[in-house]
A protein has these predicted regions:
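Fold-independent oxyanion-binding glycine-rich loops
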Residues: 8-10, 36-38, 68-71, 84-85, ...
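Conserved active-site and cofactor/substrate-binding residues in soluble primary-metabolism enzymes
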Residues: 15, 19, 28, 43, ...
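Anionic-ligand-binding alpha/beta catalytic cores of soluble enzymes and soluble regulatory domains
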Residues: 114-179, 183-184
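Surface-exposed interaction regions enriched in Ser/Thr/Asp/Glu
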Residues: 239-245
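N-terminal glycine-/serine-/threonine-rich phosphate-binding loop
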Residues: 1-76
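Active-site histidine-anchored catalytic micro-motif
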Residues: 3, 27-30, 47, 60-69, ...
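Structural motif
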Residues: 3-5, 31-34, 63-66, 79-81, ...
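A conserved acidic, glycine/proline-rich C-terminal tail/linker
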Residues: 176-236
Length: 245
């Protein structure tokens, strides 16, 4: 049974998600559709890349991942399909797929009757349905080697500490960094934008209510939260804030 995941910035107050799903369901009988999220902030390609990067490998090989965060829709930016790690991807050529390791890309032709403001429905969804139905990548377009590459920032060592930054803020106000948990020695204190958070704990539940706590989150990197509160709001920081271990 084919699986297609969906990640967009369309939100849920309009008909956009349903219109995309209508294409997928009508062209791929028996498909399972999985919503990763439709609540990416409008046009936030970096957030879309982060969420897709941490979720795609949870699915079985052969899954098709349809990702549409596309502030350049209708312009000269290309539409892409790709394969990597036994999975298939469909997305705009704006860096959304920069996390892939050794991908193969093709450029998908845009039909003349595609709505210039809704390639998610008229270009990307048909391509995802074709792949989920067994079409080969090369059947969808011409191979390219110059896809836009804008990877997420990586941490570095400055000689005394691991220096990273906040990659994403979740709906709880948790600050999710790019520092891998194994890079932090036991007892090392975590600082966010100059504020001392303390050493890593096992989980946010180990902290007192209303206090900051650092831990290794389910994505494998250092996170900073407030138990029963919002670290982003308490500290007044967001994506890009410095994290030091």
């Amino acid at each position: 049974m084919p699986i297609i995941t969906l990640l967009t910035d369309f939100g849920l107050s309009d008909s956009y998600v349903a219109e995309v799903k209508s294409v997928l369901l009508s062209r791929t009988p028996g498909v399972t559709l999985v919503d990763v999220t439709h609540q990416v902030a409008p046009g936030d390609v970096r957030a879309g890349q982060y969420l897709l990067a941490r979720s795609w490998q949870r699915f079985p090989p052969g899954t098709v991942h349809l990702a549409v965060v596309d502030p350049g829709v209708g312009t000269a930016r290309r539409a892409l399909a790709a394969t990597a790690g036994g999975h298939l991807f469909v997305a705009p050529d704006n860096g959304l797929l920069s996390f892939l390791d050794r991908p193969q890309f093709v450029s998908i032709p845009v039909s003349a009757d595609a709505a210039p403001t809704f390639h998610g429905r008229d270009v990307f969804a048909p391509a995802a349905a074709a792949l989920a139905s067994g079409k080969r990548l090369e059947d969808l377009g011409s191979a390219i080697t110059d896809a836009t590459h804008s990877p997420l920032p990586t941490p570095h060592h400055d000689g005394t500490a691991v220096m990273g930054e906040v990659l994403y803020v979740d709906r709880f106000g948790t600050l999710i960094s790019n520092i891998p948990g194994p890079d932090v020695e036991p007892g090392v204190r975590i600082r966010v934008a100059g504020t001392d958070v303390g050493a890593l704990r096992r989980t946010f539940g180990d902290a007192e209510r209303g206090t900051l706590v650092a831990f290794v989150g389910s994505g494998g990197t250092v996170e900073v939260a407030v138990r029963d509160g919002s670290a982003a709001r308490l500290l007044g920081v967001g994506v890009g804030a410095e994290v030091r271990a």
